[in-house]
Regions:
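A conserved, positively charged/aromatic
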Residues: 107-141, 153
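An amphipathic, basic-hydrophobic alpha-helix
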Residues: 62-86, 96-104, 128, 183
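Short beta-strand scaffold positions
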Residues: 36-41, 88-89, 138-139, 161
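Carbohydrate-associated surface elements
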Residues: 142, 165
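Short His-centered aromatic/hydrophobic patch
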Residues: 89-95, 117
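A short helix/loop element that forms part of the nucleotide-sugar donor recognition site in Leloir-type
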Residues: 172-189
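N-terminal strand-loop element at the rim of the active site
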Residues: 3, 8-70, 77, 158
Length: 189
């Protein structure tokens, strides 16, 4: 098996579903012997990411400002230096910055571009980048249908539905009700 370098792009690592999925994918990549790199403005989840063996590169690619465009050249350099095989964009502005960075690389050196559509963003040219990955992951069949309806130029063969799961250790199947709360409810009725 060839060791891959997968670079995930997102605005920040504070909290939320996109961030949790980013950490889970990075952890799975590292455990499988691959190199996981996350590019974001940082946040409280960076220590957890790095504890998994993944790398974090601080670059504010999610700030909605014309000044964010200055990061394109640095991201392009970073993708070359890390030997990125796959660039996985998880949010709109990071996807645009990533796409512009990739377009500046020779085709033979250009990593593959993957996007994940996590939600139903308002249809627009700005949002369309999320449907323009060489592969686009949709987190549900509803998201897939939404992408095809609002971006009809999207090739359905490029879309893959990969539903979000849960960590069964964090959310065990068996209920574990609070005994005091249960006793209170039983006593009340």
């Amino acid at each position: 098996m060839r060791r891959l370098t997968v670079v995930q792009l997102l605005p920040a690592l504070h909290s939320g579903g996109v961030e949790r999925s980013t950490l889970e994918i990075a952890d799975a990549l590292v455990r499988s012997g691959h190199r996981a790199v996350v590019v974001s403005a940082g946040g409280r989840l960076v220590p957890r990411l790095e504890a998994s063996g993944a790398e974090h590169i601080a670059l504010d690619i999610g700030r909605k400002s014309p000044l964010t465009l200055r990061h394109i050249a640095r991201l392009r350099w970073m993708l070359t230096e890390t030997g990125a095989d796959i660039v996985h964009a998880r949010s709109r502005l990071p996807a645009w910055i990533g796409r512009f960075a990739l377009n500046g690389l020779p085709a033979a050196q250009r990593p593959r571009f993957v996007t994940t559509v996590h939600g139903l963003n308002s249809p627009s040219r700005y949002s369309a980048i999320m449907a323009r990955g060489e592969r686009t992951i949709c987190v549900s069949e509803t998201v897939r249908e939404y992408v095809l309806r609002h971006y009809p130029e999207t090739d359905p063969e490029r879309l893959r539905v990969i539903p979000r799961g849960i960590d069964p250790n964090a959310f065990p199947r068996a209920a574990s009700p609070d005994r005091a709360a249960r006793a209170h409810v039983v006593a009340r009725y």
